[in-house]
Amino acid sequence: MLLSANGLTSVKDLMLGVEAYESRRSPASKISNLIRSRMETELQTAGWEVMVYPTEGVLLIQSPERSRSTDRYLHYVFNFNTAAWGFWRDVKSLSMTMLRERIYYGDSEGSIWYMVDGEDNVTLAAPAADGTPVEFSLLTAYSSGGLPGQVKRCAVIKPIFRGVGLLGSNYKVLYDYEFEELPAIGLNSTSGAIWNTAKWDAALWVGSNTTNIPYSTLGGGIGVVMAVSLRGQSTGRMTLMEITAFYEPGGVM
């Protein structure tokens, strides 16, 4: 892969004579506008790199450090499993390399880091409790729920995660192409209930590796299409298995 002012281009396509500006053929076509807008002012800035990270199944575009208070470090990541783009935020990388299937990167303070496990800022000689939770943010694709043209109101939602460690999450339904990133929330130490002693209406029933989150009763909101904005943090590797949603359809717009 080659990264240029035209975006991300396959070497194979270039050898076949495909024009680099044909963004629809690029694996980064969905974020080409983001890449190009940054290239306009940062093309000559050191810090651009492209690599495949097989262990995580992602294609990574590292971008230069920016002098700003938010998203100072922002790297673009394509997940081969979901065929979706996302960001790595606050990974203070100025240069990256692969060694034995692991990413190593250097920061502006002269430190070298590597990516492993489910926590951040873990020291080499780690005590029993070390590191900080990794934060994440997600906005699902908007959907009409199989009822295009009809307004609808979501009553309750419930995300289901599978993994190990502690998890804390905050989530909300958005309507008609709103964009809102929710505030962060602390970790939730709640685990599964004990069968013979827990009360049915108050207990959370989970598997050994499933983190259960209570159903959230939602407030206002109505629209034709819906999406879920979710933000949280965890101390271990987590997989979002599904988001269960119950909604009421209304009349035609």
Regions found by a protein language model. Name each.
Residues 4-253:
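Beta-sheet repeat architectures centered on beta-propellers
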